Regions:
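Tandem CBS (Cystathionine beta-synthase) repeat/Bateman regulatory domains
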Residues: 1-196
Length: 196
């Protein structure tokens, strides 16, 4: 094939235009299930951990989480030790309303300690494991677990564990542009589809 076999493209100009928008290089920031899990990891080395006191009123906790554009917070004791976690989706859930009613308490009277997930029940994974995993591994784990978050721990130079960050199902959904439905035990099925 010779170059003269290709027809020339008719060119034009931006007439009467002083400025114009351009396509930014967002393609390099696209994430896929095969992308590194670190792309959606909420690393406390890069982002401050959001903490709430165990005795804080639930309404104030919700406000603090929303005002900080988060969906998850660490619950701390008076001694600044992490005693649990709390997620926005649970604060807003019907399950919380039913739990309050069944205990004879108004939801507005609940404090963080009443509804937090105790630290001993939190799903955790070592940073050394997740640093080589893919987003798909984390997403599959989250949609098939009881909770929407996974706390990631690391070890300091003395070999002591500390909370390094977390993975969040709502955050991953937003970053990937996915509609993901959490597994409910009675259904036993998860649904993952790409919203286009």
């Amino acid at each position: 094939v010779d170059l003269k076999d290709f027809k020339q493209i008719e060119l034009s100009h931006f007439t009467d235009t002083k400025s114009i928008n351009y396509l930014r290089d967002d393609a390099s920031h696209l994430l896929y299930l095969e992308s590194s899990a670190l792309e959606v990891f909420r690393d406390y080395k890069d982002h401050d951990a959001l903490t709430v006191r165990a005795d804080l009123n639930i309404k104030d906790v919700k406000t603090k989480i929303i005002d900080n554009h988060k969906d998850f917070a660490l619950v701390i004791s008076a001694e600044d030790k992490v005693v649990g976690t709390i997620a926005l989706h649970y604060i807003e859930s019907q399950a919380l309303q039913e739990r309050a009613r069944s205990s004879g308490t108004k939801p507005a009277d609940l404090v963080t300690h009443d509804i937090m997930l105790p630290i001993a029940k939190v799903n955790t994974v070592s940073y050394s494991i997740i640093k080589n995993t893919k987003i798909g591994h984390i997403l599959n784990t989250l949609i098939n677990s009881d909770y929407h978050h996974i706390v990631v721990y690391d070890k300091n130079e003395n070999g002591e564990k500390y909370i390094r960050g977390y993975f969040s199902l709502p955050y991953i959904r937003r970053k990937l542009g996915l509609d993901v439905y959490h597994v409910y035990q009675k259904e036993g099925v998860s649904n993952l589809n790409k919203g286009i």
